[in-house]
């Protein structure tokens, strides 16, 4: 039967009673979120830590344990967070999204992909006890009840005081007995597996099942405090068996004793092992073995400043080892009194005089005295210093002894480079391990590791910290790479505008994943049965190709009127009701005709566009309006007709102006969509729908002199304005979230209609209607003052220094040479064997700013291999619109470049 280490006598709610008579109050805390790229958040986190230390210093205790335990997040919790942002979640209603999430859940449960971890901060506070040392020693050999004479009322009062002292910023919760079991499992399997947390229940809830946990039913484990010696002895036995030369002349007795004669210190190890015999197999007779190495910090950097220290945060980095940490803390004002500092200096002088044998050893003592004087100066300059001592312990685990040895050596070197002196006590591994466990006292070794500081200065270490980005609920869009915990970043699409501006802007060089990130969000918008509108001006129709696979998508060529259902019209008189139709017509044509809005021609145009005027004359389209103008005799009519005929004759105006009628009952092209019907479909919420406007035949004017624009440039500007007005009207008719996607937004520059309707207006008032913009650009400078209110921003890899600087500024990150190098050379780097493609496994790397926190991340892949194929824009693998048949489906595989496309189909 297994027993807890250290032995426990009783667990009651969040109280732990150890066999040595100590009583502990246990709490679970959440780390303070820190933005590594914004000093203000680090300062706030330091202030919170100083507040925590100040609160703990008021608790009458001499022993506090703060441990950071790593745990694996339950995939089901992540799934609940994803669906938690959907008010009417129903797997039937959202069948397509459900299939994507089912696949994601299977991949998460496999443990190979999308595995999330986090860190639980455990704080245990010892209640002061009056038991003498002799009583505690007796309790270890004689069965003495440690609870005899316990003042339960005093204990309850102490526990309340402890809980109420913890600052709310850390979201304190009372631990339960199940968490002690979990902590034991975590500590004994470090490096083997990372267990999920038990459910946290309220022990005072009457519905909570009541039980008294036994302290004799822990999993049985075996400790080997000299794991390296065991491994070395195994190698020695193998050499004996193989008849290695150095073993051939040994007698039978010497064969047994030779190893330990050669290496006399092997009984005390630097690495210990914890085996699980209850899980033994034929290949693992001792069961799975966790190799662990622990060290403390014997000396801290010889500086006192407020710089952010990563210190304990190293356990969350990509160190290629499983790791936890513990701080054993005590507080005393005696530590910062001048008398105490003076006595310490006298001791150093005496030790130096007695022990220094030469000038170099004497110099070491002089250095320590200089550090002491700097410390005294620092606390004198601090207002109301709170003295504290802390012993820092780090534990690293692996299932491979050799690997652990190499990693611990590298980590020790890393600590030394940062000014810390690690102490790896030979023979003291289990002592350190035990001090990391709930219910354990600080030992003599722990006392030796205590280092003196103040609450203010040690707050710079920020041991209780985290880097969490994204929304509490929503769709998965990225993996947090700020550390190695792998948090899945969520984006709340349906409720995005509740907290204000919801628009987002991405920037990244071609081939670095910008369009991929936008398509991922588009996929989720449509899978949520919401409406999306896209302007696709790519020459190969990359958005049309992708959208046709994920939603009931309508693709209309804004120049020719081509759709996969036949030619359609974007004529405002056909597509919009009154008065929207009149507004769009005037905004579209008056600038083209170079007619001022205050002229008689403009007034005449407004009169004939009136719905009542058109109704009695059968004017249902722009072509019929032109026919009526041909019969009118007013000079204004002749001028309007002249201009209409000019533009109607151009090949790129067909989508807005029907060809001449072939017969009296020829109504021309039907409207590309019935907007009223669309609104009703979206109200039903059952059919995702998207519109893609193909505008590749409509180039915008890039020059600064408006007179240099060609007719095609002028018509393109008018078309973009009409698309913006139609889209804005659609959004206004649909209840719920609508999203406008604009990739490579440089085409919008200078078009005030589009900028106002689809960028500035949603930023100001779109949140009231749930609408927002998702934009992308290769160069961040395209995001001018019109995008100033956008808070959510993404940045992916860049290829030039100029673009890298603009991208860093865009995402509110400091422009540092190290970050410039990272965004150019270390973000989705090219494959070393083929520089034209991104290195395997490095696609979509970049940063995400959720409006509050910025983190380095890797954007999610498209959650379907087939869909990912249609989203791929790599030149050699890209599916072009020309590869689709007349129904929008992929053509049969043909020889040559697209022969592999049959697999995508």
Predicted regions, residues:
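P-loop NTPase motor core of the ASCE superfamily
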Residues: 110-111, 577-623, 782-905
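P-loop NTPase motor domains
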Residues: 43-58, 433-488, 537, 570-764, ...
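Switch/coupling segment of Walker-type NTPase motor domains
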Residues: 33, 68-98, 109-112, 516-615
